[in-house]
Amino acid sequence: MSEFILEMRGITKQFPGVKALDNVNFKVREGEIHALCGENGAGKSTLMKVLSGVYPYGTYDGEIVFKGEVCKFKNIKQSEQLGIVIIHQELALIPYLSIAENIFLGNERAKKGIINWNETIAQTKKLLQKVGLEESPHTLVGQLGVGKQQLVEIAKALAKDVKLLILDEPTAALNEDDSENLLNLLLELKKQGLSAIIISHKLNEITKVADSITILRDGKTIETLDMKHDEVTEDRIIRGMVGRDLTNRYPARTPKIGEVIFEVKNWTVYHPIYSERKVLDHINLSIRRGEIVGIAGLMGAGRTELAMSIFGRSYGKKISGEIWKNGVKIDVSDVSKAIANGIAYVTEDRKGNGLILMEDIRKNITLSRLGKISNHFVVDENQEIVESERFRDQFKIKTPSVFQKVEALSGGNQQKVVLSKWIFAEPDILILDEPTRGIDVGAKYEIYTIIQQLADAGKGILMISSELPEILGMCDRIYVMSEGRITGEVSREEATQEKLMRLMTKTAIQEGA
C-alpha cells in the first residue's frame, strides 16, 4: 500500500474567465499534518472543494486517489462515507440545537427511523472527552464560545469515522488560548493515526504543527516542504506564496499627527439582553488627525462592543457618555447619524455584516453613499461604474469586472471592497475591527498600505486587532482593554508585547489593589 493516504494529480478547475487551479499536484502521507499555504485566491479552498465533492467529478480535470482507490465524488456525502471530512472557516453548527444533536445531525444513531437517544448521549460524552470538552451533551451550541464550537466540529468529524480531516482557517476567530488548545488536540489526534490538512495564514502555527507544507500560487503548485529535511522558515514560506521576498511585514511610515479630532468621554454600555450587565465601563479615548490608534485586548474585553456602540449605538442598551468631533459634541444615536457625522465602521465579520455577497462589486462599494451618485433619487449607473472602477484600480482589487459578484472574490479582495465602501462615504473617522482577519501576508501588506494612506490623508483611524505584532507594527498609540475597561494607554515607542499582555490580563480587582 502507498505511504500516501491522498494523491491529487493534475487537478485543473476553471470558472468563467478564470483558471482557479492549473495542473495542481498534492499528496498527503498517512498520519501526517499537511499544511496548505498560499495567498487569498491561490486556489487552496477550491482544491479542498474538489477533494470533498463540493465541486463534483466532471467539473474539473485530474485524478483523486484516496487510500489507493481512484475516487469520483459527486457530492460531500460520498467523500464523508470514505472518511474525508472538511471543517469550513464558517462553522456549520446550529446554535439552537444541543451539542449532541449537532454532532449527529445527518448521522443519527437510529433504528427503523427512531433515534436512540441513550446511545447518542453516550457516544457524545465519549467524543467530548476525546476533544477535551467538559460540557453536557445537552448544552445548546449557541451558549458556547467560538473556541469550544470548533472542538464540537472536530467531535462531529470524529463521529463520522474520519480518516482525513480538513481544517480551513481553524484558528482565524480564536484567541491565543483557544488556538493553542485546538493545535494541541490536532497533534494528539495525529498520534492516534489521524491524517489532517490544515489551511492557515498564521505561519507560526503552521511551522509548529505541520509535518509537510505545500505552497500554492496563482492556482499552481510551487513546492512541497518537508519540516524534517528542508530548512523551513516563515520567510521562505512567504517567498513561495507571494513570489518575492517580503522583508518588511509593515510599510514604512512617518506619521503626520495633528490635533485631536475625535473623543469618547465616559462611555458606558450595558448588555442588550442582560440589561444589568455592564459591558463597557466609563471608556475615555481620543484620536488625533492622521493618527492610527490601536485597541488591544483579549476576546471578551469589549473591543467590538465599543466599536459598534460608537457606530450609531448598533450594540448595547442604556448607553451613556458623549462623543465629540472637532471640539463639538455629536449625535450618534443611530447608524445614519453616525455616518452623517463622518464615522465609518469596518466590521470584523465581512461576510455576515460587511458585504452583500450576492451583489456585485459596484453595488457594494457605492451602497454607503448612494446620494453621491444619484440625481433626483435615481442612481446614475454610469457614475456608479466610474466610482467603483476607480476603487478597483486604486486598491488593486483582483477581478475581471466590477460586475463580478462579491462572493466569488478571495478574502483579501472582499476586504478591499469593504474598505472601498466606507472610504466612498468620505469619513473622517474610520473604525477598523480585525481588518486583516483571514487574509494572507501579501494582501495584509496591501491593506496596511491603504490604512496608512488614509491616515496620511488626515483621517483618524481606530484599529482593533487580536494580533499584537499587527498592533505594534501599525499603531501610533495603543489603548488596552480588559473586562470592558481601559487598563492602559501606551505610546508606540514604549509598547512591547509583554507590556500589552500585562495590561490585557489586568482585572478590576488588580486595578483597585
Curated annotation (Swiss-Prot):
CDD domains assigned to the protein according to its UniProt record, in alphabetical order: ABC_Carb_Monos_I, ABC_Carb_Monos_II
Gene3D superfamilies from the UniProt entry: P-loop containing nucleotide triphosphate hydrolases
Residue intervals of the ABC transporter domain: 6-243, 264-508
InterPro entries, A to Z: AAA+_ATPase, ABC_carbohydrate_import_ATPase, ABC_transporter-like_ATP-bd, ABC_transporter-like_CS, L-arabinose_ABC_transporter, P-loop_NTPase
Protein topology in the membrane: Peripheral membrane protein
Keyword Nucleotide-binding: yes
Family affiliation: Belongs to the ABC transporter superfamily.
Protein function: Part of the binding-protein-dependent transport system for L-arabinose. Probably responsible for energy coupling to the transport system.
Protein name: L-arabinose transport ATP-binding protein AraG
Organism annotation: Geobacillus stearothermophilus (Bacillus stearothermophilus)
